């Protein structure tokens, strides 16, 4: 969205969870920590999420739900909300991308884009 009042930036850090993975059974677990930064000028509440999780074979799982980890945080301008969650995929490499549906205090509904990010077992990519 180009309107500077509704500027939400999303950053992601991922981590492979070796202890929760079972490669022989095509189970690869990852944790991710997301920071949702309100760089706009109005308060915005994160209402819901939409994820597209793609494994290395191109299979896509779509996930929708209210809030994030049971919360619908209200994020003040200049503030951020950070949370951690996880995903399990059936290949050593995959991607996640999506959006958060936001509701600004002035009544405007808008989407905050989550750019694609990689899930990868260490050493799986050269």
Curated annotation (Swiss-Prot):
GO biological process: error-free translesion synthesis
A Pfam match: DUF525
SUPFAM superfamilies in alphabetical order: ApaG-like
Domain ApaG: 2-126
InterPro entries for this protein: ApaG_domain, ApaG_sf, Uncharacterised_ApaG
Protein's recorded name: Protein ApaG
The species this protein was found in: Pseudomonas entomophila (strain L48)
Gene this chain is encoded by: apaG
């Amino acid at each position: 969205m180009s309107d500077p009042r509704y500027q939400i930036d999303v950053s992601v850090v991922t981590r492979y969870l070796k202890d929760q993975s079972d490669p022989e059974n095509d189970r690869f677990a990852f944790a991710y920590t997301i920071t949702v930064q309100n760089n706009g000028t109005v308060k915005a509440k994160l209402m819901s999420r939409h994820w597209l999780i793609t494994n290395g074979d191109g299979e896509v799982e779509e996930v929708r739900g209210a809030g994030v980890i049971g919360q619908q945080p209200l994020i003040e301008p200049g503030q951020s909300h950070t949370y951690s969650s996880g995903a399990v995929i059936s290949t050593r490499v995959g991607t996640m991308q999506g959006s958060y549906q936001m509701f600004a205090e002035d009544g405007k509904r808008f989407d905050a884009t989550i750019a694609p990010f990689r899930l990868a077992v260490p050493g799986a990519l050269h």
